């Protein structure tokens, strides 16, 4: 607890300041909170907005890193390229990721931190919205800790005069020393003003082995990734907008090093025994959307979507005894939704329906040391020849009770069908199949009181649920250190109820935001040891019935001392207990929630040297996390004995806007070359890191 006093003292020093959502933006807008454009100050949620300009200045090395300085978010990395944000105590499939309102979550998402958020290129985003604790009313299953919506760049034909042709481009670069990384992106923009625009982009990123302070180079932490994207915007009329988009992103040679003999012990962590565990993954998304606004009749606005999403993953593992296996999956997700909005005497009503169907094939082959197939298994990481369908109907009404108080009421009905065509029965070792379905009704009630133009107070409660997916029902693959998870076909949905109260204040100089939350957990699905040993790993299965809670506090502050100097700070912590099965006796024990966010503080200032130059000094201060449950303590490859040490990281950035077309940035991250690891991660973070970025428009 050595950093606790420092954290709270520094936090009190900035107790009347709040970090600006976007510098210079007077009325930031959110789409995700209510499914239509709304001022952030008018929604009864905790909303974090990351603008494209922020991404361009920071040039993060991957999508999860975008959230590294976000209060209340802990970006765990099982391995380099495999970041998984924890939002209000939840990660993986208990957070929902959207791209332009389309679910990236699919039925193959596995328990705990996973690598799937790494398939999003942050450089395609015009902004990223994070709604914390939103619940399941608007978007369905999974949105427990938070909902993230990546709003992609459009081709902006409305920014140009009618019938005027335009051609533009942009080149971006980022290089760093401690990762030996290089990122390049090129964009091209063509179109006809007020009618049609086409935006094309390509990103290539090469990441070398990390150089960590104290323990040196981390072998096999390097990887490569690249992506392409296309977006076409066409205005049929001034109020009717059509969109077609295509995105493809690939990651290659991602090692899970902590499982192998090449990992390095730190603060007493154990070293894996596998000779290799590496994989590739790719994601493809194509969609068409139509938006119509200012309509006459019962609907004033309509937004509809058709999408196809493909995700492929493969993994090669060589065990200590030379036994080798190659496995993976190929999943197609077909999605459609439509939402309508009506301005009525009963309020602004949003209602609609959504349907997603996931189809997946999986494989696993056992190989000899020469790479020859000696056995083909019944399934891959989860059941083969599987389908998963989600049908939902939702309604939301925002009622303006008076000039100061708005009430937000919502409800959603969801029906889910799961069909596992083939899976390996853990008891018999023979092929089996399963069919299951579930219904859920989730509700939300929230209100916001606007004291005046500067101050508001909001409160509410939101129900959420997460239905069992392919991975829950039929997984046959590694879990944590020295564990293997086997199929668990008899599961039911998890249920959550989140309570939240918060407030924000905003005037010309001071901004302040605070939110407190409490999430009640019912029937959560948890891994449970059986006592069996399978292929040198301890078997775990999944069970419903875990009950518990998570609560926390988030504080953001910022103060403009003058036109050039802004100081900012943030404070966040989580705590909670949940029922667990620590051993094969099946006796229930209440233990701390796994991988809890330690008390974390962000502090810094930004000074504009001139209209074209700025400097920023920031810090991330994290307390020691020694509140562990049984499975945390047994995860010895990732969590040191007794817990993860605290740390204080300081970063410096400089920016120079040479002209309207050219931006140059230079940064020093981890100035003091601190040895540190984000709690629950499988590797240490880079030591002192020199970063150079450039953007040129033409």
What does each model-identified segment do?
Residues 446-448, 502-504, 686-698:
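Outer-membrane beta-barrel "beta-signal"
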Residues 329-339, 390-392, 486-492, 498, ...:
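Outer membrane beta-barrel strand-and-loop segments of large Gram-negative receptors
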Residues 350-452, 477-480, 583-588:
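Signature of Gram-negative outer-membrane beta-barrel scaffolds
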Residues 110-111, 124-126, 132, 137-215, ...:
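Outer-membrane beta-barrel translocator/receptor signature
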Residues 400-407, 415-416, 517-520, 541-631, ...:
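Gram-negative outer-membrane beta-barrel transporters
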Residues 24-160, 501, 679-680:
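Acidic, small-polar-rich N-terminal luminal/periplasmic segments of exported/outer-membrane proteins
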Residues 219-221, 239-299, 310-331:
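Flexible loop and strand-edge segments within Gram-negative outer membrane beta-barrel domains
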Residues 250-252, 259-265, 312, 359-361, ...:
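Surface-exposed extracellular loop regions of Gram-negative outer-membrane beta-barrel proteins
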């Amino acid at each position: 607890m050595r950093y606790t006093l420092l954290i709270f003292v520094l936090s009190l020093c900035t107790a009347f300041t709040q970090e600006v959502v976007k510098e210079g933006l007077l009325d930031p807008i959110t789409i995700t909170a209510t499914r239509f454009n709304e001022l952030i100050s008018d929604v009864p949620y905790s909303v974090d907005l990351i603008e494209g300009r922020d991404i361009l200045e920071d040039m993060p090395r991957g999508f999860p890193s975008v959230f590294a300085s976000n209060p209340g978010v802990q970006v765990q990395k099982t391995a380099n390229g495999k970041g998984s944000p924890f939002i209000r105590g939840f990660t993986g499939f208990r957070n929902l990721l959207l791209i332009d309102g389309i679910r990236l979550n699919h039925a193959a998402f596995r328990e705990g931190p996973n690598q799937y958020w790494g398939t999003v290129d942050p450089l395609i985003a015009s902004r990223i919205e994070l709604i914390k604790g939103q619940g399941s009313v608007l978007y369905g299953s999974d949105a427990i800790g938070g909902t993230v919506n990546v709003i992609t760049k459009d081709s902006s034909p409305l920014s140009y005069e009618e019938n005027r042709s335009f051609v533009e481009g942009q080149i971006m670069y980022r290089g760093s020393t401690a990762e030996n990384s290089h990122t390049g992106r090129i964009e091209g923009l063509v179109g006809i003003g007020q009618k049609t625009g086409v935006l094309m982009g390509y990103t290539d990123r090469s990441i070398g082995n990390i150089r960590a302070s104290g323990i040196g180079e981390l072998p096999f932490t390097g990887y490569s990734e690249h992506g392409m994207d296309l977006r076409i915007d066409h205005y049929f009329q001034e109020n009717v907008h059509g969109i077609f988009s295509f995105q493809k992103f690939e990651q290659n040679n991602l090692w899970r090093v902590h499982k192998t003999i090449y990992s390095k012990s730190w603060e007493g962590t154990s070293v894996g025994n596998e000779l290799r565990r590496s994989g590739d993954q790719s994601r493809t998304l194509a969609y068409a959307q139509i938006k119509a606004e200012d309509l006459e009749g019962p609907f004033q606005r309509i937004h509809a979507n058709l999408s196809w999403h493909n995700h492929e993953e493969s993994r090669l593992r060589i065990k200590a005894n030379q036994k080798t296996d190659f496995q993976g999956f190929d999943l197609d997700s077909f999605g459609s939704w439509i939402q309508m909005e009506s301005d009525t005497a009963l309020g602004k009503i949003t209602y609609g329906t959504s349907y997603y169907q996931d189809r997946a094939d999986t494989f696993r082959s056992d190989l000899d040391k020469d790479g020859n197939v000696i056995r083909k298994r019944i399934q891959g990481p989860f059941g083969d020849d599987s389908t998963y369908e989600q049908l939902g109907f939702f309604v939301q009404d925002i009622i303006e009770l008076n000039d100061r108080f708005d009430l937000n009421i919502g409800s959603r009905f969801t029906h889910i069908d799961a069909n596992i065509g083939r899976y390996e029965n853990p008891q018999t070792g023979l092929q089996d199949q399963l069919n299951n379905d579930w219904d859920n009704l989730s509700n939300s009630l929230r209100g916001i009181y606007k004291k005046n133009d500067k101050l508001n107070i909001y409160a509410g409660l939101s129900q959420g649920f997460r239905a069992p997916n392919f991975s829950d029902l039929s997984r046959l693959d590694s879990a944590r250190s020295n564990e293997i998870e086997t199929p668990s076909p008899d599961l039911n949905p998890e249920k959550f109820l989140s309570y939240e109260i918060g407030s924000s204040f905003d005037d010309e100089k001071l901004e302040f935001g605070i939110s407190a939350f409490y999430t009640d957990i019912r029937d959560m699905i948890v891994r449970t040891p059986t006592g069996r040993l399978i292929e040198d790993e301890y078997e775990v299965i999944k069970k419903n019935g875990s009950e518990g809670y998570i609560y926390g506090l988030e504080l953001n502050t910022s103060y403009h001392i003058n036109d050039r100097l802004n100081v900012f700070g943030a404070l966040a912590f989580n705590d909670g207990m949940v029922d667990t099965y620590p051993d094969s006796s099946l006796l229930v024990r209440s233990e701390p929630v796994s991988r809890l966010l330690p008390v974390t503080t962000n502090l810094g200032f930004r000074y504009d040297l001139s209209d074209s130059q700025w400097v920023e000094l920031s810090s991330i201060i994290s307390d020691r996390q020694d509140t562990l449950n049984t499975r945390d303590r047994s995860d010895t490859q990732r969590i040191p004995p007794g817990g993860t040490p605290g740390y204080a990281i300081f970063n410096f950035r400089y920016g120079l806007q040479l002209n309207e077309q050219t931006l140059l940035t230079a940064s020093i991250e981890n100035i003091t070359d601190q040895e540190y690891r984000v709690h629950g991660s499988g590797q240490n973070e880079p030591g002192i890191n020199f970063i150079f970025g450039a953007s040129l428009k033409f």
